[in-house]
């Protein structure tokens, strides 16, 4: 069993553009599977977990004792604070960060906040995937990073919970989230695609040419079953119980009973 980590969009492109052989693709945004892998490389997409955007930091971060859910954007835009996020074109956490900033501008009624946050986050603070920011936090080279809650929990970091209206965690706020949009590279070279804000939902799919199909399906069965769900919950990642799949009718028999 081997894993290879990258931003979800990068993972999908390794399959579609580089011909990378793999059994499964797990994405932190289920729509990456829908947009980039189905129908040419995969047939179905199981939605199995949720998450929330948070601001991760350590005790050594500037103003760590002061930052809270009401003043975080004021703290971050002080000239001596370094903050970062992952690359939007490579990693859903990156474009979700930009969505959080847009939603924050509306939620806090702070015109120009998105542009200010964007301008004060230099290119060197934008990394290919969100977990790379952890090293910068732990070394003290970065004060704050926009991360998934599960990543902060798993790395033992402090983190600031953002309001539900902007943290992309709640289906109840889906209508508000939709007001945020980010332009990304499209499926064809030089093309563009627009991502719209949605609650964070993770997806998993089996590739059509999976070389180890039965073992891969056994892993999916474990992941969306009680044991896998319990592990996710302990690691700060709420499972979707039961998992859902729009293509349930074509799922392998092993998975059908575990999916709604």
Which sequence ranges carry the predicted segments?
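A short alpha-helix-loop-beta-strand transition element characteristic
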Residues: 45-48, 109-111
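Exported/periplasmic ABC-transporter solute-binding proteins
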Residues: 5, 9-18, 29-30, 37-38, ...
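Acidic, polar ligand-binding/catalytic clefts
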Residues: 26-41, 46
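Short, solvent-exposed loop/turn segments at the edges of secondary structure
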Residues: 50-51, 199
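Short alpha-helix C-terminal cap/hinge motif
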Residues: 1-3
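Short acidic/histidine-rich motifs immediately flanking catalytic phosphotransfer sites
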Residues: 20-22
